[in-house]
Amino acid sequence: MKKQRLNISKLGFLLSVMGSAVGLGGILGFPTQMYNHHGAFLIPFLICMVICAIPVLFIEMTIGNKYRKNHIEFFSEVGGKKGAFFSWLHSTTVILLSTYYSVLVGWTLINIIISFTSNLNKGSYFYHNILQQTNDQDISNLNSLGNLNWMILLATIGVWIILGIILLGGVEKGIEKANKIMIPFLFLMIIILAIYTSTLSGAKLGLNVMFDLDAKELLNPGLWKDAFGQSFFMLSTCTGTIYIYAAHAPEKQDSTNQAFVVAFGTSLIGILTTIIVFNSIGAIAQNQGKTDIKDVFQAGPALIFQVIPQLFAIINNQVPILGNILAILFFVTLFFAGMSSLIGQVESMVNGLEYEIHLKRKQALAISLLGAMAVSVLFTFSNSPALFNGLAIWVAQIWLLIIGFILLIGISPYGWKLYDTLKLYNNENSWMKWTKRYKIVILIIAPILILINIATGIYDFIINIINANFVYGTVGLTLGVGLVLLLTFILTYHKNIHTGFNKLFKIKTKTERG
């Protein structure tokens, strides 16, 4: 029997999508990219956001809202086995992302606890005493991973347990209610901290570097590759999540307006968080008597976890306890952001198993959580952060772009021929009409730009393998490519595999047993 979907409110839909989108991709990823490329990053980021990422968001929202189906149900129906494979690729890619994303959320949980103690005054306590990372670059073999970090492991398990409790309530009772609390709190805290850190002595030094624009950097292909990956990642497109939430949203809503609100909101959070980080780096650099902020920290997934605790330690030296209070607020905010995004990532798989393979929600949730949690153990060793790049390049810079490219080609006259139907639905309900010019952008310009960046990402990956980079050659290939494709194949052909298994071992079905 087909399961009936319950609607969520317009506000619930908007906050759920924004929660899935903003996450740690905006709060951790965006400041890191700005730290690497400075002000030059904003130009390709905005170009990609407007020409490629937002149009994909339009389409995903429109499909989910019009057809009231998740990505797997819809593409399996219009595209057969090829469509099913394409749709499951969304879920397997994003569930892989959740395996190391959950560890980062676990880091925030530990920092919340540290913020209640005097260890915050040590500044780098988490980075040196908890994370205990001895190699933040490349690792040559699995032995280089170091020791299993039990505190990180327990925090990660805690994150999965909290996530399971929220997801048990489903889209309506669990996800919508959680995001109605988390997202407004997130916005409020980010705005307060951005204003406060701007008043710190030395903040101007950081902001000058943040908005420094080197025109030559725009000729760097790596800049454009990073910008494209970041824009898709920050909007949560190509993960399946948008279809799911849109299918539960009120019918005939203005998807174009909602997409612009989400894009503006997530970009605003990313920029405000970056201002907080650069204000903090400037203040720390001045406190250390340094004029070049590059001498203070190294870029990477742990950037915020290096910067923010040191800032609050400095504040505590000036105004006792204030640093602890601000640290608690910041890391609770970061935890909410991470959880809201992690919810969407795992729901993409759970929803597919529930509605397409017809498992009970508890069964689908148990399979998804236990499987992802088992893989996440790999990222709880002392030097595991060095593994992140091997997966991140496939998730954010290759798979998400491949899915976006196939979607844009798929709705064209050369694929499933959906563009005119979606255009009619949008134009009936939206203030912004899909014109002939917009059709050229969606079906020609955007796919070409995305394809160029896919090629750049794959080229970089191959170069790293040629250079014998262990992370790319092992974790990147086995998890980023092998595991994703294997899971996608199994989920696409699960009925055929089940039938073949029964025939091979001569197992009779209930019907055959009478």
Which residues does each predicted region cover?
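Extracellular loop-to-transmembrane helix junctions
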Residues: 34-59, 151, 400, 477-486
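C-terminal membrane-solvent junction of multi-pass transporters and transport-like membrane proteins
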Residues: 89-93, 357-369, 394, 398-477, ...
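Membrane-embedded translocation segments of transport machinery
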Residues: 2-7, 11, 176, 180-343, ...
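Transmembrane helix-boundary motif of multi-pass solute transporters/channels
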Residues: 9-46, 205, 241-249, 258-260, ...
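Transmembrane helix-loop junctions in multi-pass membrane proteins
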Residues: 24-39, 163-174, 195-208, 216-221, ...
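Hydrophobic alpha-helical segments and their helix-loop junctions in multi-pass secondary transporters
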Residues: 56, 101-128, 187-211, 279, ...
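Inter-helical loop and helix-membrane interface segments of multi-pass membrane transporters/permeases
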Residues: 4-5, 33-36, 71-89, 103-172, ...
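Membrane-interface "cap" regions at the ends of multi-pass membrane proteins
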Residues: 1-28, 56-61, 65-78, 84-88, ...
